[in-house]
Amino acid sequence: MARINYSINGDPETTSKAMGSELHISPKKSREVCCKIKGMKASEARKFLEDVIAMKQAVPFKKHHDGSGHRKGPMAAGKYPISASKEILKVLKNAESNAEYKGLEPANMYIIHAAIQRGRVIHGFMPRARGRATPKDTETVNIEMILSEVR
């Protein structure tokens, strides 16, 4: 596995970082979730992700929205990416724990950076009839999140 660095570096005294490596979630869905929570307070983002997991609130899809239906609220196309939201919530909780360990106040922190990068592809094959095989690849995602006290 290659060494993965953060895209940006903030002030180490006022920021906390967390990263999730090679998570088995969709890159397209995780991109849309990260775009939505970027700029939110950490507590608001946690509530939003928990509502998405419970299918109470949809995530607006702005780029990858073919075949998506209209949802309630100020959005056109939206979906409920449950598995991506669960993994991003884990990374957010990790970033809050890192902030608490550093002596920062997690309740007052904003998400200044939430980004995904495509990870490696896990190649696999599915056996088919008559001795054939169909490729079945699993995409992975690297998520990085940076919280800051000042906005």
Curated annotation (Swiss-Prot):
A GO-annotated cellular component: cytosolic large ribosomal subunit
Protein origin, superkingdom: Archaea
Family annotation (Pfam families): Ribosomal_L22
Keywords: Ribonucleoprotein, Ribosomal protein, RNA-binding, rRNA-binding
rRNA-binding keyword on record: yes
InterPro entries: Ribosomal_uL22, Ribosomal_uL22_euk/arc, Ribosomal_uL22_sf
The keyword Oxidoreductase is assigned to this record: no
A molecular-function term among this protein's GO annotations: structural constituent of ribosome
SUPFAM superfamilies reported in the protein's UniProt record: Ribosomal protein L22
Region (Disordered) residue spans: 1-23
Record-level GO BP terms: cytoplasmic translation
Ranges of Polar residues composition bias in the record: 1-18
Main function: This protein binds specifically to 23S rRNA. It makes multiple contacts with different domains of the 23S rRNA in the assembled 50S subunit and ribosome.
HAMAP family recorded: Ribosomal_uL22_A (MF_01331_A)
Subunit structure: Part of the 50S ribosomal subunit.
Database matches in NCBIfam families: PRK04223.1, uL22_arch_euk
Recorded family membership: Belongs to the universal ribosomal protein uL22 family.
Protein name: Large ribosomal subunit protein uL22
Annotated source species: Methanosarcina acetivorans (strain ATCC 35395 / DSM 2834 / JCM 12185 / C2A)
Gene: rpl22
